[in-house]
């Protein structure tokens, strides 16, 4: 994957996370679209790309969210690299195993994130078990659905002009 494509995926996730998601889902489903983007990149690219995109996305998210700068960057770096290493050993082609990977990556991210905050003796944000599992469930569902949509996107071909309409055709 080219650097511009990786950067655009991370920036798009950051923009959605900070602008659109708070208005669409509110506070009842905590989603981390940056983490979803990092895990997607980790499953489709190399471990080095996942490591660098996790570090960049996490530090930018820390800067925008007002937390301790670097904590989310370290957590997302560890998650991205770990998922990429697992992805090089295991081929995942079905939706449910992808959901499990997104779910497990969110749990790993939460444990590293909360562990770093507890070592820094800072007030731990969003530390209840139900909120962590809610975020893992939300990220798992969103990640699995987005992975399938992005996988099916190149198969969408435009058939041609019939009158003034363009008819899309999905090839399954």
Task: Give a label for each model feature.
Residues 1-172:
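Terminal, non-globular segments
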């Amino acid at each position: 994957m080219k650097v511009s494509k990786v950067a655009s995926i991370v920036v798009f996730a950051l923009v959605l996370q900070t602008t659109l998601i708070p208005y669409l889902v509110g506070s009842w489903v905590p989603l981390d679209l940056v983490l979803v983007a990092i895990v997607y990149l980790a499953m489709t690219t190399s471990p080095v790309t996942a490591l660098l995109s996790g570090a960049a996305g996490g530090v930018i998210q820390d800067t925008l969210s007002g937390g301790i700068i670097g904590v989310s960057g370290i957590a997302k770096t560890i998650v991205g690299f770990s998922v990429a290493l697992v992805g090089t050993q295991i081929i995942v082609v079905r939706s449910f195993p992808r959901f499990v990977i997104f779910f497990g990556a969110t749990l790993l991210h939460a444990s590293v994130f909360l562990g770093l905050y507890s070592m820094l003796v800072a007030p731990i944000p969003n530390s209840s078990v139900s909120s962590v599992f809610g975020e893992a469930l939300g990220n798992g569902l969103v990640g699995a659905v987005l992975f399938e949509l992005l996988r099916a996107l190149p198969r969408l071909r435009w058939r041609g002009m019939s009158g003034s309409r363009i008819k899309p055709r999905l090839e399954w």
